[in-house]
Amino acid sequence: GKMYIVNMINNFKGILVQEYDPEKECLVGEAKNVFLGTGRGYTEGPHIYHIGEYYYLLMAEGGTGYEHMVTMARSRSIWGPYEEDPGNPVLTSDVDNPEKLQKCGHADLVCTQNGEWYMVHLCGRPPKGSRQCVLGRETAIQKMVWNEEGWLRLACGGRFGQWETEESTGIQEYLFPEEEGKDYGKEDFDLEIADSAGNNETAKNADIAETLSKT
C-alpha cells in the first residue's frame, strides 16, 4: 500500500494530504487541501484511518480551551471529497457541569485485538468552583462504538467525556521486557567544557561525573 502525510495547514486553513515515499524518504506528488474544517474553527490535529470502504478524517476543533472538541468526516477516497459527520462533535465537554471532564479534544483511535474501539484524547480537570486546570493538559480514554450509519459514537451515549469508561474484555496484559540498565562513568561524558568566562571546567565536570556514576 501507499503511505501519506496528513497535517494542518498554517493558520488553520485546512487539512493537507500528500503521498510519502518510504524508500526515498521524501514527499512525492502534489499536496492537496482535502478539508477546510466544519466551521467550528481552529481545525488541527488530523488523523486519517482507512476503515472498511471509507477514509475517516479525525480532527481537533474549537481551540484548546473549553470549546475543544473532536470532529469527524469521511470519504471513499483519501483525496476527498469528505462529508462531515452529521453528529459532530463526536466528543466535547459539558461546560455547564464543572464536575465533568473539560477541554476534551485532540484525539486518536485504537482498535483492540477483539475489535473494540477506544478513543484517547486530551482533557482538563479543573477543581470544583474553578476554571483553572492546575494539572495542565491530561489524557483520558473513552470506549467507542460504530452506529448503523457507519459513524463513530461514544459507547456511553451523548458526546461528553466521562471520568470512567468500560474496560476491554479478554485482553491480556502485555509486559514489556526490562532492559539492563547502563552505569555511566567519567568516560561517558565530554568533560572539556569551558564556562562563560572561558575557564576550563574539566575538574568540576569530573567531580560531577564521578558523583553520577555512584548514584
Residue ranges and their predicted role:
Residues 1-215:
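Carbohydrate-active catalytic/glycan-binding domains of CAZyme proteins
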